[in-house]
Amino acid sequence: MDENKSKALQAALSQIEKQFGKNTVMRLGDNTVQAVEAVSTGSLTLDIALGIGGLPKGRIIEIYGPESSGKTTMTLQAIAQCQKSGGTCAFIDAEHALDPQYARKLGVDIDNLLVSQPDNGEQALEIADMLVRSGAIDLIVVDSVAALTPKAEIEGEMGDSHMGLQARLMSQALRKITGNAKRSNCMVIFINQIRMKIGVMFGSPETTTGGNALKFYASVRLDIRRIGQVKEGDEIVGSETKVKVVKNKMAPPFKEAIFQILYGKGTNQLGELVDLAVQQDIVQKAGAWYSYQGNKIGQGKNNVIRYFEENTQIAEEIERNIREQLLTTGTNGAVQIEDEEEPDLLLES
């Protein structure tokens, strides 16, 4: 750089530091790059599809999909995983529909979960921002964007038009929350619903509520869909679920994860572990028999799941190996669970 330009730059940087504080402007190479902390989603397959082993802390996340597709289940599992690692979590229940007993079944410590049921959208987002700014919260869930009703709409008449009020509210709130979340390393997950655009001839007519602001501010956007049923005999015990990573600022996007959500239990974590271990040749499969490090561990997938339930240390060791292999080397295309054997038989725990 020219000497005069260099002096001018130094003078400008000194003035900026004096006015706004140290490290307001810095050279990118001066600081060592720190790995982004991730919170597991409770599904190993989805953690791998996200590329960093889970959802990133300090970022805005959007999870959207049709009704009863597993959106709240996914966020409650993320809360449970965050609490296991010593984190403090909050759930802003704008829909007034949180079931404490179901949350407990998914592993959430409900005695230490902060819950708020706000009266209107402004109150919900103000509470979220204050919790983020406190620096004491690791994960906040807002359920859901569609239920963040502006105060003017609540106080108005039923037939009144309130065009764009919710979109403006979300845009204003996200401008504040995004920077605060990064500074306090707090993850904020927004659950969103799907609506249909009228008169769309080409392309998908689906859109999410709350305007476009959340689409821009979110570092990760997950589209969750129920694609089938899980049966045990004639009884339906869960749903086959597909999650597409629609947007990902942390790793390559557009990967997919297919896994099972069992009613009242959450994701079929050990079932995923068995399939991924076979896929990565960590566990060997010959006919119906599965073996690990030369020792047979079970005949049939359900017996292997039972073996992992009884030998948690081995299950954790295999999971670590899978994460090391797939998150280091990366995966191409969709990360899927292919259930070759016993497709509709699941272990009742």
Curated annotation (Swiss-Prot):
Can catalyze the hydrolysis of ATP in the presence of single-stranded DNA, the ATP-dependent uptake of single-stranded DNA by duplex DNA, and the ATP-dependent hybridization of homologous single-stranded DNAs. It interacts with LexA causing its activation and leading to its autocatalytic cleavage. PANTHER family: MITOCHONDRIAL DNA REPAIR PROTEIN RECA HOMOLOG-RELATED, RECA. Coiled coil: none annotated. SMART domains: AAA. Its main location: cytoplasm. Pfam families: RecA, RecA_C. It is found in: Cytoplasm. Belongs to the RecA family. This is Protein RecA. GO terms for cellular component: cytosol. ATP binds at G65, P66, E67, S68, S69, G70, K71, T72. It comes from Acinetobacter baumannii (strain ATCC 17978 / DSM 105126 / CIP 53.77 / LMG 1025 / NCDC KC755 / 5377). The keyword Ligase does not apply. GO terms for biological process: DNA recombination; DNA repair; SOS response. One of its GO terms (molecular function) is damaged DNA binding. InterPro entries: AAA+_ATPase, DNA_recomb/repair_RecA, DNA_recomb/repair_RecA_CS, P-loop_NTPase, RecA-like_C, RecA-like_N, RecA_ATP-bd, RecA_C_sf. The keyword ATP-binding applies. Gene3D superfamilies: P-loop containing nucleotide triphosphate hydrolases. Keywords: ATP-binding, Cytoplasm, DNA damage, DNA recombination, DNA repair, DNA-binding, Nucleotide-binding, SOS response.
